[in-house]
Amino acid sequence: MKTLEKYILFAIVLCCLLQLGQAIKCWDCRSDNDPKCGDPFDNSTLAITDCQQAPELEHLKGVRPTMCRKIRQKVHGEWRYFRSCAYMGEPGIEGDERFCLMRTGSYNIFMEFCTCNSKDGCNSAGIHRLGLMGVLTGTLLSVIVAHLLRQ
C-alpha cells in the first residue's frame, strides 16, 4: 500500500471515530404532554433518543444535534419542562454544565435553559461515554489500520 493511500485510510478511520464520539442520547419529552417529564424527572416509561437519528430541522439545514437540553419555564405561575436534543450553542455557560442560562420577562415569565454533552441522558436533571459497541468498533478499526500501515 502506498504512503498516500495509508494517510487517506487513516483520515477516513479517524473521521469515523470522531463521528462515534459525537453521538449523544438525550431524553425527549414535554411536561405539558407527560407529567413524568417534570421535576422530579421520572424516565421509567420514556425511551432515550439517539440524537444522530433526530430529524434535520428545516431552518438549520446540515446542522446535527451535539448536545442535550433541558428547558424549565414558568408561565403565569405554571412550571413546564422540555427535554430534547440541542442543535446549537455550547454546553452550559462558557462550557461549564453546572450553570444554566436564566431569563425573566414581563407577564411573570421565567426561563432556565440548560445544555450538556458530558454523558448520555445528561438532560435528566442535572463524561460522554461511547457504548460497548463504539469501543469495540474503534478497537477493531485501530487494529486494522495498524496492520495496513505496517504493510
Curated annotation (Swiss-Prot):
Keywords: Biological rhythms, Disulfide bond, Glycoprotein, GPI-anchor, Lipoprotein, Membrane, Signal, Transmembrane, Transmembrane helix. Residues 125-151 form a propeptide. Residues 24-128 are lumenal. GO terms for cellular component: cytoplasm; endomembrane system; side of membrane; vesicle. Pfam families: QVR. Disulfide bonds join 26-68, 29-37, 51-85, 100-114, 116-122. Disruption phenotype: Embryonic lethal with aberrant tracheal dorsal trunk development resulting in tracheal tube size defects. Compromised epithelial paracellular barrier function in trachea and salivary glands due to reduced and irregular septate junction formation. Residues 1-23 form the signal peptide. A lipid is attached at residue 124 (GPI-anchor amidated serine). It comes from the Eukaryota. Residues 150-151 are cytoplasmic. Glycans are attached at residue 43. It is found in: Vesicle; Membrane; Endomembrane system. It is a lipid-anchor; GPI-anchor. The chain crosses the membrane at residues 129-149. Belongs to the quiver family. Required for septate junction assembly, possibly by organizing the preassembly and transport of septate junction proteins including dlg1/disks large 1 and Nrx-IV/Neurexin-IV. Involved in paracellular barrier functions of trachea, hindgut and salivary gland mediated by epithelial cell septate junctions. This is UPAR/Ly6 domain-containing protein crok. The gene is crok.
